[in-house]
Amino acid sequence: SGIIFVGDSRTYFMQKTLLREYGKDAVAKVSFVCKTGEGLSWFETAGERVMRSEIARLQSDSDKPVAVIFNLGVNDLSSHNSGNGVDYKGEANAYLARMNTLAEELESDCRLFYMSVNPVNTAMKPTRKEAQLRYFNDRLQSRLNKRFQWIDTYKYLMKNGYSTYNEFK
């Protein structure tokens, strides 16, 4: 049994914070497969191989399920990465295709979770648009394979006081 977080800088800094605040005992049964500034192409070319290796390692130690939590998407929704706007609908479809295939390929003793892309403050990061994030999240939530449980951090944060620059326009 164990937990694997797969993601980008949000996952990387979550790992760093847990280690700094609580020490290595807090993450003894937690693996982090992450790379800052990356997204789906990194996952397909490097991250997935590491994730599968971690799944096999954790499954060999226990007969309990491994939880795999995906936290990817925000970097692929940045116009910095494309130079001239983002095909956010295409990005959502690419994620759906890969994640749904992955859900079929992985052992049934993996529990799959997908964490929504969090809201962004567009005053500080104008390269991302809230409407595109919401589309991406809504699309994934409604069309991911049923093996995935959706973790809606976006709505939780918006409901509990996080605000974005767009709200003030």
Regions found by a protein language model. Name each.
Residues 71-75, 103-134:
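Active-site segments of SGNH/GDSL-like serine hydrolases
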Residues 29-31, 111, 147-150:
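Conserved beta-strand segments of alpha/beta enzyme cores
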Residues 88-100, 129-136:
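Charged helix-capping and loop-helix junction motifs
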Residues 4-6, 113, 149-151:
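Hydrophobic/aromatic beta-strand patches that form the interior of the parallel beta-sheet core
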Residues 12-13, 17, 21, 57, ...:
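Structured segments of extracytoplasmic/periplasmic soluble domains
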Residues 2-90, 94:
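Conserved SGNH/GDSL esterase-like catalytic core that processes O-acyl groups on lipids
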Residues 120-169:
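Catalytic His-Asp segment of secreted/periplasmic serine-dependent ester chemistry enzymes
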Residues 33-35, 115, 151-156:
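Conserved beta-strand termini and adjacent loop/short-helix elements that scaffold enzyme active sites
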